[in-house]
């Protein structure tokens, strides 16, 4: 049972798993901090989010729906939505999404730092920390960055849940008068 833990960490990078965890925690009103950590493709960046029931904003607030196509997309992504980023390995018979080891180390470090701040009581709100990476390999692969990447001036930004909360979020929107 998730409610028995002091902290939940999801470092799968899988939005479906993260959305399920968020839905479970929010629906059951579990007062357990959850840390989500994920990489962007080809070292383009990384994110760590601290979400706790009772604070503004939740993981579902990171997910948007394209008005034209109806497809879901990640509002936090540095990679422009609608692109195919899967690569195939010849002879391997499988596809994968390319991530670098360096970005994974940065994500792990940000995650540990976030957890330390949680247990020191340094966060009073939910938060997402986003770090821009190098776009060299990304652009050489013919991919395009998102407006979020282009508009983010600082290499690392921290955004409060009060700013990323979505008014019509099915899990946290109504409790904040939205």
Predicted regions and their residues:
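Glycine-rich phosphate/adenylate-binding loop
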Residues: 3-7, 11-178
């Amino acid at each position: 049972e998730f409610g028995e833990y002091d902290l939940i960490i999801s470092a799968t990078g899988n939005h479906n798993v993260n959305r399920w965890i968020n839905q479970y925690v929010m629906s059951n009103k579990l007062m357990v901090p959850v840390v989500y950590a994920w990489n962007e493709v080809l070292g383009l960046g990384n994110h760590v989010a601290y979400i706790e029931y009772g604070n503004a904003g939740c993981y579902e607030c990171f997910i948007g729906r394209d008005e034209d196509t109806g497809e879901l997309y990640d509002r936090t992504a540095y990679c422009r939505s609608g692109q195919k980023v899967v690569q195939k390995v010849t002879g391997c018979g499988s596809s994968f999404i390319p991530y670098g080891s360096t970005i994974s180390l940065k994500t792990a470090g940000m995650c540990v730092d976030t957890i330390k701040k949680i247990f020191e009581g340094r966060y009073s709100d939910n938060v997402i920390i986003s770090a821009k990476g190098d776009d060299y390999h990304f652009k050489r692969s013919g991919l395009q960055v998102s407006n979020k990447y282009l508009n983010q001036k600082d290499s690392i930004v921290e955004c409060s849940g009060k700013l990323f909360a979505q008014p019509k979020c099915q899990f946290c929107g109504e409790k904040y008068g939205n």
